[in-house]
Amino acid sequence: MLGNIYFALASGLAARERLPEYANAVFAADFDRAYQLVDHHSSQRGKSDDYAGVLAMADASLLLECDEEAEEGFRLAQRLIRHSDDQLRVVSCRNTGWQALLRDRYAAAASCFSRMAEDDGATWTQQVEGLIGLALVHHQLGQQDASDDALRAAREAADGRSDRGWLATIDLIIYEFAVQAGIRCSNRLLEHAFWQSAEMGATLLANHGGRNGWTPTVSQGVPMPALIQRRAEYLSLLRRMADGDRAAIDPLMATLNHSRKLGSRLLMQTKVEVVLAALSGEQYDVAGRVFDQICNRETTYGARRWNFDFLYCRAKMAAQRGDAAGALKFYTTYMQDALRCLRTETVNVRRASAAVPVASRASDDVSARLSAKYRRAYRYIIENIERSDLTTREVAAHINVTERALQLAFKSAVGMSPSSVIRRMRLEGIRSDLLDSERNPSNIIDTASRWGIRSRSALVKGYRKQFNEAPSETIWR
């Protein structure tokens, strides 16, 4: 899972100024020490100025695979954001986006990261982080053109600030994508249908599967976080092994041993990546040795929501060892999982460069941030969004809570009131319809009426505030 490494880098980069020791520990891949440096923040529950420390503590918990503790930490950090509804909304998207990505819930992650990148209340670093998260999601789904778009937008934002840390991270991601996709799309792994059928972006092709090496745009002599440097060296070794270079074997085995310190998720993923590289380089003895190291505890992680690479390796190794029946069985499981993912996860995933968010996307990122009880309220809103008389009082009554409780729950989890959520969904739905040439939306008022907005003045005022243009301008784009 690529998200582990880049979540760590994003966390460290965001905390550099307020928590430099924590950031340095994360950059050194010492997640235990990073947690120890911010653990004391968990007891300071009422201090709003301690928000950054609590957020770092939650990040460190997630890096250490303490998911329940991390989720509680994220909730606490959001409760401490009292100075800005904008920041509460953005941070809520950020926290839920990373959790969703690390759980392989790509549609929800993409929705959250898109919101984060597009939100006018986000800082430029938060927008870059959102775009990086979106690029990771698209890559995991084999949508490399869309991933390139997100990275291009992230680079433009970071270039404008000359931030070397973010620029180096973006360079590393580009190299990562080139190496990982280059290996999976090699001629010796033709049965890896999920990747062989993926779209390959121009940036990836220009890097020739990572054979051009890692060329960061950061000036020579500038200190580079150890986590970035080690990852680049590891990717270079993977590329060499995939090209049949046996001199890469021992350094890669050493990297495997080091990965044990970074948690079972990353260890499992590293082993699978080494197996794929060895198979691509026809180094079957290495592939077999590393595959056999994947113990039962790690295959529990192998049964995560989506893990095509592991399932493919299992089928490929069975075939390599002469177990034709086992290979067919495992390959069937692999294909079923790949198709199921494409059918369920790609529906709401969209390019960062697309003109507008679609209303249907809201059901992912908002519901992902709400508790189960209030997700019922949100579903009720979606089902009745076209009704102009829909009120928050009615929504609250539907789930048997007070209107005040509904307001507080939405504000703390999403950073918006229920009425703001309703208004945003309606305006996004209107905009989506206006941009849909198949609908031929000649009458703006009729289009707005379908989404529950009857007042022309309310439509124009709200639409311009949200999209910085009038509805008529959208039609004539």
UniProtKB/Swiss-Prot annotation:
GO BP field: positive regulation of DNA-templated transcription; symbiont-mediated perturbation of host programmed cell death
Residue ranges of domain HTH araC/xylS-type in the record: 375-477
Disulfide partners: none
GO terms, molecular function: DNA-binding transcription factor activity; sequence-specific DNA binding
InterPro entries attached to this UniProt entry: AraC_XylS_family_regulators (IPR050204), HTH_AraC (IPR018060), HTH_AraC-typ_CS (IPR018062)
Residue spans binding DNA: 393-414, 444-467
One Pfam family per UniProt: HTH_18
Keyword entries, A-Z: Activator, DNA-binding, Hypersensitive response elicitation, Plasmid, Transcription, Transcription regulation
Task performed by this protein: Positive regulation of hypersensitive response genes involved in plant pathogenicity and partly of its own synthesis in minimal medium.
Protein name: Regulatory protein HrpB
UniProt source species: Ralstonia nicotianae (strain ATCC BAA-1114 / GMI1000)
